[in-house]
Amino acid sequence: MKSLVLGWALGFALVASPAAAQTFPKLAGSPVVDQADIIPAAEEAALNTQLLELQQKTGHQLVVATVSDLEGNDIADYGYRLGREWQIGDKEKDDGVVFLIAPNERRMNISVGYGLEPVLTDALSGRIIRDVVTPKFKAGDMPGGIQDGVNAIAEQIQLTPEEAATRAAAAPR
């Protein structure tokens, strides 16, 4: 009887967890998904073009997603699962990047596939958010902050492996 009750309680906990009820915006053929509607149309079109050209040039896929609600989830976990759901990056190389912004919750994250982690480390991603994106957001320029963040990420993933490793190692922790 105890095992039946324990099994039922565990099953209920799994069903009731935020991950089980997770809904993601749809990736509809362009690398920018602005569900939170914070990027003006002209800037969104320019970002889409830039990100498609970056993918063509490097083979690495970078997407920008804005969401109005994380549904109670941690942003890093949400970004990771969003990348898996959308199948960002090459399946074999695991080299995708998700730049996720949840403006209503004042959260940002850069989720990096394992294949790009030596190039775009957690420390460097944190520096990009802290030193490049956040100042623009605080000044009320969210589209500018997103653009500058994309530029910093794109610059890093276009470096040679040696240059990228040197820059990543120099990022303050």
Each language-model region and where it sits:
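Bacterial N-terminal signal peptides
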Residues: 7-17
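Positively charged n-region of N-terminal signal peptides that target proteins for export
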Residues: 1-7
